[in-house]
């Protein structure tokens, strides 16, 4: 039995190649069935995200899995092979654990990958390509990822601009659930900010954008209110937190607009986070009392400090992955003995049944019970020790002291 993992990711391949080896969600069930059949492994899980495509098989050969990937996507070996990484057994297990814990991610320690791995596992179960080994592997992996996040600081510090912006708000306000938030822009960064805010209990969000339809589409997901940029002065006085990220070449929030809003707020403090380049909020806003303005540069210094913290945590996480992958392989190796134990027990029972049947027949024919039992015991002993005796004799004749020592240990002859 051997575990195989092959894949490409953001570190080994360009976006162009990653797109070519990705698996469409509506085809991944059939793909996993095809992979399991092709490799005759019976078990296969495919993880396919924007940053990586990875194939995990049980009882497969690396070359067969690579061949299947190339054939499936109609790619040449010359295109794929230089970008591939391959792992086997404990290294394959450790790699999956590292991936799931965010140790192999573009952003070290990011939590989203664990959810993506879980989704891939669910799809594999739906496809019928998960049995005992893969089920145990992935369930163990999820536990290890949780252990790493619990016992280390790998996910504690913000390392994205969006997350850092929300983390700053959490430090300033005791509870985000009672705050009102104005988001300026409706791009990917603001969408990520909105998701973090919602996860942290924010209930009232307003999204201002030049194109109202784009803002409305985002608001549907987060239960927010969409407005145009021209409506910002009407909503700004109600905002405890303002986070802005647009592509505007000129500032959208000027000192005068913010000053007027603060007066209407009766000088209740306002946190403004400008994560746009060029700036969305005039730098002079920082001169206003009760206005606390932070820029992307302020956040970047926080992120750099946090990345250093995560790298330290990653060293601890690697040790956990090492230990847990070794323990999993011990379980795998224990499985390999099950068939041998079952076969040995069956063989011994067959010998016993044959000899007992003979003894019963002799007793039925009036044989002396003491002699019959003694003969049964002797024959049973001789048959059961025949194979070990031959092995001991062969090892001795060949001068194989290592095998001889192992046999003595297995037979319980060397007792401390």
From Swiss-Prot:
NADP(+) binds at residues 185-190. It catalyses: (S)-4-amino-5-oxopentanoate + tRNA(Glu) + NADP(+) = L-glutamyl-tRNA(Glu) + NADPH + H(+). Its EC number is 1.2.1.70. The active site is at residue 50. Keywords: NADP, Oxidoreductase, Porphyrin biosynthesis. GO terms for biological process: protoporphyrinogen IX biosynthetic process from glutamate. PROSITE patterns: GLUTR. Pathway: Porphyrin-containing compound metabolism; protoporphyrin-IX biosynthesis; 5-aminolevulinate from L-glutamyl-tRNA(Glu): step 1/2. Substrate binds at residues 49-52, 105, 110-112, 116. The record marks 95 as: Important for activity. It holds the Pfam family GlutR_dimer. It is an enzyme of class 1 (oxidoreductase). The keyword Lipid metabolism does not apply. Belongs to the glutamyl-tRNA reductase family. Catalyzes the NADPH-dependent reduction of glutamyl-tRNA(Glu) to glutamate 1-semialdehyde (GSA). NCBIfam families: hemA. Possesses an unusual extended V-shaped dimeric structure with each monomer consisting of three distinct domains arranged along a curved 'spinal' alpha-helix. The N-terminal catalytic domain specifically recognizes the glutamate moiety of the substrate. The second domain is the NADPH-binding domain, and the third C-terminal domain is responsible for dimerization. Homodimer. During catalysis, the active site Cys acts as a nucleophile attacking the alpha-carbonyl group of tRNA-bound glutamate with the formation of a thioester intermediate between enzyme and glutamate, and the concomitant release of tRNA(Glu). The thioester intermediate is finally reduced by direct hydride transfer from NADPH, to form the product GSA. This is Glutamyl-tRNA reductase.
